[in-house]
Structure formats: C-alpha cells, structure tokens
C-alpha cells in the first residue's frame, strides 16, 4: 500500500474515534500499550538523529533513536525507530505528527508493536560472525558490491583455498583428496570435453586415458589389445583356443540344442544324423525337393490349399463375380414379382 494512503487511513481512524468519543481503553492505541517505540517513515535523507530529537521530543522524553543507515555508505535510508520514556507519549506523537510535512516530505508515524533493539556489535565480533557464516561467493567471483556491510567473509586467503576464487587458485579445491587416482580416469577428459580442470574428482592422466579405449579415436583400439595376447579367459568358450574343438560336432550340437540346453558343447553318445541325408517321406515332398534343386519350384504351389482340408479358389475375382451373380438374380426375381402383380391387376380389371 502507498505510504500516503496509510497516513490518510490513520487520520480517518483518529477522526472517527474523536467524533464518536471512544475511551482510551477501547481505542486502537490500546493494542500497543506495551510498546514505547514508534516507527517514523518518509524522513528526508538530510535529517540526522539530532533533528529527529528536536521534532519528536515536544511530546515526551526520548530514550532511544535508531536512524537506519546504509552500512557501506553511511547514508540515511529514510526511516527510523524512536522510543519514549512514557508509553502515552507515543499516542500523542502518532495523533499529531502522522501526516506532518517536514522539509517538503510527508512523514508517517505509527506504533511499533514488536521492535527489538539492535545491539551494536564491535568490529571483532562482526568479523567472527562473518567467518562463521563462510566465504561470500560473489566476492570469490569478484562481483560483491556490499563491501563491509556483507554478512559473509571477504577473506582472500579463504576464498582462494575453496576453489571458487580466481582461476589460478581453483586448483586447491581437491588438493587434499589423495584418493583421486583411485576413482579412475575422467571419461569427459578422455573425450576431450572435461572443463573442470584440476578441480575434477577423477584422474586426468593422459597415459591411463590412452590405454582404456575411451580416449581419442586412434587410442580406442587398445581397449582389447591385452585380450589378443592373453587368449581366452579362464572358463570361457572361445573356440580358437580350445584344444578339444571339433567344428562338425560343435555345429551339429548347436543346431540340435534347444534354449537352455546344458549339453551344448559336450560330445553326445548317439550318432548325429543330418536330416537332409534322409530320404523323402512322401512323393509330394520328393517332387518339391527336386523342383527346389532344379530351380523350377513354383511358389504358388505353397500358397494353395489342400483339397482334403479346404476348398481351392482358382479365380481371384470369383468373389466379385459371385456378388454380381447374386445381384442379377435378385433383380430378376424382383422383376418377376412385379410382372405377376401387374398380371393379377389386369385380371381383376377384366372381371369388373
């Protein structure tokens, strides 16, 4: 809400209570009977604590004046808190000075219910509190504009040791970490995309990055070079390094095995017979096999139905022809019925 609107609202409340003759116990001032502080807003920036004493002391003795100033520049922010020795003086100040004109500015005077007096801290206490809060991140980036009014520490040494300071000081962020090499090589560094530099938690060893197969394109071939020398690993199934490997037996056992067959790769006792070496089971199968061998196999043969199982549709357009046939028959039947109806009508006319 606009401060001038608040000033007018307070003046309306006071005028209405005065017209109605409301007692002090029922007045809105009784809500702040336990507070001797008043809030003063809209103060001209040139006024000092002495000027405020001169203006407000006419309604009672003032025991505390807190003119809020900027901690960096020391300039007034335009509002203050005053405390009277007698609480009844606050009622007089609010009723008489609210909306008053001081050096061309309308000031607002109102009760202050829960004001806590700010204890002034000495420089040593202020420094200790800043150190406890930590280093200012904006100061580490060189962007803090609060100066001495900042709540956080501006210690350049601490800023350099956190890794958030200047570029040359950020390397100290992970210097205490002795297990950095144990975490492995940074994959972003291997691809040439890591931007963390020395602050990265993972190793940036170029030699190790080259032997992992994750580095540059010419170094990725070294990923499996060690397996070429070591051969098949213990317990593996590499055919090139097995002494008992038999191509024919392995191929036949692979063809005949099912999913989850534990006998794969083991010599079987029974004789393996290729199914293709067996004779044809029927004459049709024999003819089909001969056609496949000679290249004269008709694919349409496999698309036909068996006469014993289902009917064979020789003509692809038979369905449309059947539909036309049924349609023509229904048309003839309808014409015949109409002709019979006309004949019956003519016979009746003759009788009449």
Curated annotation (Swiss-Prot):
The RRM domain is annotated at 36-114
In this chain, composition skew of type Basic and acidic residues spans 210-230, 243-296, 304-352
Source taxonomy: Eukaryota, Viridiplantae, Streptophyta, Embryophyta, Tracheophyta
Swiss-Prot/TrEMBL GO biological process terms: mRNA splicing, via spliceosome
GO CC annotation: nuclear speck
Keywords recorded for this protein, A-Z: Coiled coil, DNA-binding, Metal-binding, Repeat, RNA-binding, Zinc, Zinc-finger
Q: Where are the zinc fingers (C3H1-type)?
A: 130-157, 180-207
Query: Which CDD domains has this protein been placed in?
Result: RRM_ist3_like (cd12411)
Checking InterPro entries in the record gives: Nucleotide-bd_a/b_plait_sf, RBD_domain_sf, RNA_proc/Spliceosome_comp, RRM_dom, RRM_Ist3-like, Znf-CCCH_4, Znf_CCCH, Znf_CCCH_sf
In residue numbers, the region (Disordered) covers 156-179, 210-352
| Annotated source species | Arabidopsis thaliana
Q: Where are the transmembrane segments?
A: none
Name by which UniProt lists this protein: Zinc finger CCCH domain-containing protein 42
What molecular function does GO assign, one term? Answer: RNA binding
Coiled-coil regions, chain positions: 319-348
């Amino acid at each position: 809400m606009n401060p001038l609107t608040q000033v007018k609202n307070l003046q309306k409340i006071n005028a209405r209570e005065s017209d109605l003759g409301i007692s002090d116990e029922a007045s809105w001032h009784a809500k702040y009977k336990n507070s001797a502080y008043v809030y003063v807003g809209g103060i001209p920036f040139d006024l000092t604590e002495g000027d405020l004493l001169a203006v407000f002391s006419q309604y009672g003795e003032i025991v505390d004046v807190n003119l809020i100033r900027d901690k960096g520049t020391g300039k007034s922010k335009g509002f203050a808190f005053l405390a009277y020795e007698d609480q009844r003086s606050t009622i007089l100040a609010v009723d008489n000075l609210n909306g008053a004109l001081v050096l061309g500015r309308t000031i607002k005077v109102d009760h202050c219910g829960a004001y806590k007096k700010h204890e002034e801290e000495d420089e040593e206490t202020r420094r200790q509190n800043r150190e406890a809060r930590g280093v200012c991140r904006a100061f580490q980036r060189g962007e803090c504009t609060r100066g001495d009014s900042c709540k956080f520490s501006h210690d350049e040494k601490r800023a350099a040791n956190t890794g958030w300071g200047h570029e040359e000081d950020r390397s100290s962020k992970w210097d205490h970490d002795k297990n950095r090499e144990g975490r492995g090589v940074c994959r972003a560094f291997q691809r040439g995309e890591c931007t963390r530099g020395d602050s990265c938690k993972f190793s940036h060893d170029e030699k190790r990055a080259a032997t992992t197969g994750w580095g540059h394109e010419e170094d990725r071939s070294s990923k499996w070079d060690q397996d070429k020398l070591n051969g098949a690993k213990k317990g593996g199934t590499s055919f090139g390094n097995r002494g008992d490997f038999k191509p024919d037996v392995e191929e036949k056992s692979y063809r005949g095995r099912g999913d989850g067959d534990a006998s794969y790769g083991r010599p079987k006792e029974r004789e393996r017979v290729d199914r293709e070496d067996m004779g044809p089971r029927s004459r049709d199968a024999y003819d089909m096999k001969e056609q496949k061998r000679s290249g004269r196999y008709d694919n349409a043969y496999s698309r036909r139905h068996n006469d014993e199982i289902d009917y064979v549709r020789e003509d692809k357009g038979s369905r449309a022809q059947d539909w036309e046939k049924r349609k023509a028959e229904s048309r003839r039947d309808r014409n015949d019925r109409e002709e019979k109806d006309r004949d019956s009508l003519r016979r009746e006319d003759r009788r009449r």
